[in-house]
């Protein structure tokens, strides 16, 4: 199991940079009127949530790492942004006080048991018609990482295979699903050519 406090604490800069993931751009351009209050799970140092708030959305962000969350709060304050941040295990988040319209899970790679627990919670938390946005390393990433040192977990079960995720999310309709090669430039943590999965799903 990764010690995320140690991993974030080992660098004195944003581990994954400040640029949001491509799925954020897709959501803002194609689904803006349906996002509602946004939940970002595994938000780390806050690059996804800050991009959404800068575009006018209200956001709650949850991450397991106190180091990353405190760094995110510091950047929020510097940028004069208001984001509700919670420190929790994202495989079993707490009840939310605000109804959400959408949820983002970006580069959140954990065990099958934890992932399925998280998905059950998301299903129970999103309203009918709520949107789930997923982006992360695809099943071929170990090969890409060996060649390009672009990051990501080495265990296949931690990666995002669209077919497996679709089977784990039977209560959702898939609107967008792809697995592509993409060049990452996300801080020192993710650099180089990578195999990336993207999905957009709607709760039935």
Language-model segments: residues:
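Conserved class I S-adenosyl-L-methionine
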Residues: 1-33, 140
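Conserved SAM/SAH-binding beta-strand->alpha-helix loop
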Residues: 65-67
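Conserved SAM-binding loop
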Residues: 72-73
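Conserved SAM-binding strand-loop segment of SAM-dependent methyltransferases
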Residues: 79-90
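A short acidic, Gly/Pro-enriched loop at the edge of an enzyme's catalytic core
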Residues: 95-102
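A short, conserved alpha-helix within the catalytic core of class I
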Residues: 110-122
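Conserved beta-strand signature within the Rossmann-like core of class I S-adenosyl-L-methionine
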Residues: 129-137
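Short alpha-helix
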Residues: 156-177
């Amino acid at each position: 199991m990764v010690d995320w406090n140690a991993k974030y604490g080992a660098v004195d800069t944003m581990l994954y940079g400040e640029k949001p993931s491509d799925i954020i751009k897709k959501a803002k351009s194609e689904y803006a009127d349906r996002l509602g209050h946004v939940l970002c799970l595994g938000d780390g140092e806050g690059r996804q949530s800050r991009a959404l708030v800068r575009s006018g959305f209200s956001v709650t962000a949850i991450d397991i790492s106190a180091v990353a969350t405190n760094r995110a709060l510091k950047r929020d304050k510097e940028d004069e942004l208001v984001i509700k941040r919670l420190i929790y295990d994202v495989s079993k988040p707490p009840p939310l006080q605000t109804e959400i319209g959408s949820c983002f899970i970006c580069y959140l790679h954990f065990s099958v048991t934890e992932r399925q627990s998280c998905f059950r919670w998301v299903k129970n938390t999103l309203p009918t018609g709520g949107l789930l946005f997923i982006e992360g390393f695809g099943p071929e990433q170990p090969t890409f990482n060996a060649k390009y040192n672009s990051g990501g977990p080495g265990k296949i079960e931690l990666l995002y295979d669209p077919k497996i995720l679709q089977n784990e999310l039977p209560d959702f309709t898939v609107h967008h699903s792809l697995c592509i090669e993409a060049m990452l430039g996300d801080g020192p943590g993710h650099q180089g050519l990578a195999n990336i999965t993207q999905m957009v799903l709607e709760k039935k």
